């Protein structure tokens, strides 16, 4: 009887161990694989090219052009600013640079008192209205607050379905103060092959910070 009881005890113990092992295996199988946020080389090449451009053009706009932008901002005329000859002149400079480097869009942003960024001068053929709210994104803050040449974490599609990658650089006045940021939306058709890096795609990886 004792021997049978001992055998029964051992069998019960074995059953418990097997059940525990089964539960552990099940937990391992249910683990989701870690997401890979490594930017593909082909996409990184586009981003890096755009960052070189925005840094170079911000340097060209430093001082004179940015001083004039600062004056326009200080006048606080809102949408009426776009009717001025000075706005037209500043916009023409951005349009020239935009065509020179092949950018899709080129514009200047400044933050408001709430930390949201709005557009000022826009070099596009159909410019956004002065004061259009662009919200607040980490790359805006990196450029304006930290003085960095900054990149968006993912690309996007404009209203015509064109893929773009956005980059930003601080704009300094003659006193060495950052008064705005220059933005370039650069063509990124390579995103057709990497939809996980397109925030307007259903396959987007969700990386935005």
Predicted feature locations:
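A short beta-strand signature within small-molecule sensing/ligand-binding domains used
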Residues: 161-170
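Helix-start (N-cap) segments at beta->loop->alpha junctions
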Residues: 184-201
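Extracellular/periplasmic ligand-binding regions of membrane signal-transduction receptors
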Residues: 36-87
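Extracytoplasmic/periplasmic sensor domains and loops in membrane signaling proteins
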Residues: 122-157
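Short N-terminal helix-loop-first-beta-strand/juxtamembrane motif that initiates sensory/input modules
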Residues: 56, 95-116, 201-209
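C-terminal motif of bacterial Sec signal peptides marking the signal peptidase cleavage site
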Residues: 19-22
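Short hydrophobic/glycine-rich mini-motifs in sensory/regulatory modules
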Residues: 172-182
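Bacterial signal peptide processing site
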Residues: 24-26
């Amino acid at each position: 009887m004792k021997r049978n009881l001992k055998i029964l005890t051992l069998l019960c113990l074995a059953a418990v161990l097997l059940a525990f092992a089964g539960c552990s295996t099940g937990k391992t199988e249910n683990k989701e694989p870690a997401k890979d946020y490594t930017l593909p080389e082909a996409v990184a090449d586009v981003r890096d090219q755009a960052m070189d451009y925005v840094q170079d053009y911000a340097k060209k706009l430093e001082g004179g052009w940015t001083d004039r932008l600062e004056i326009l901002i200080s006048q606080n005329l809102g949408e009426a600013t776009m009717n001025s000859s000075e706005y037209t002149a500043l916009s023409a400079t951005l349009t020239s640079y935009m065509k020179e480097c092949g950018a899709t869009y080129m514009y200047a942003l400044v933050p408001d008192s709430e930390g949201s960024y709005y557009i000022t001068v826009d070099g596009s053929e159909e410019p956004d209205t002065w004061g259009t709210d662009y919200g607040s994104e980490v790359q805006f803050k990196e450029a304006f607050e930290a003085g960095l040449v900054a990149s968006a974490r993912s690309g996007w599609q404009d209203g015509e379905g064109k893929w773009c990658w956005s980059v930003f650089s601080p704009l300094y006045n003659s006193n060495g103060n950052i008064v705005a940021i220059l933005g370039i939306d650069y063509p990124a058709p390579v995103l057709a092959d990497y939809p996980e890096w397109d925030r307007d795609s259903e396959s987007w990886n969700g990386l935005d910070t």
